[in-house]
Amino acid sequence: MPFRLAVDYDGTLFQGSWPKIGEPKWDIINKVKQFKEEGAEIILWTCREGISLDQAIQRVKEVGLEFDAINDNSPSQKEYMKKKLEQGEEFATRKIFADFYVGDDAMNLDIFLSINVSETCRRFENR
C-alpha cells in the first residue's frame, strides 16, 4: 500500500482566511508535490463543503496539486476495506485513513517541511 498523506486546506496549503480563499503556501504545496512524485496517495482533508469546497478544489488545481481523494479514503485504502468486507470482516467507518495528517492544527508545519520524502515513502511501501 502506498504512503497516504492527508492534507488540510485552510492554514496549511493556503493562508488561513476562512471562508475566503487565501494565498498559496508554496513551501507546503511543493512538499506535497514531492510526495505525489514519489508515489504517495494524497488526500485533501478539509472541513470545507459545498461552494467553499468547490472553490478550494479549483484553487488547488490552479497551483498544480492533484489529489487521489477529497474528504474520502485513498484508492488503496478503499481496496483494502473492500477486501476485508469480502472476507467477512466488518470494516465500515467514516474515518479517513492516512499515514500522516498535515494541518495547521495537526502537525507542526516546520517538521513536515523537514521530512525526507523519498525515505518516508520507501518505508511504507512494503507493509
What is the predicted role of each segment?
Residues M1-S76:
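Alpha-helical substrate-recognition element adjacent to the catalytic core
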Residues E41, L53-R127:
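C-terminal cap/substrate-recognition subdomain and adjoining C-terminal extension
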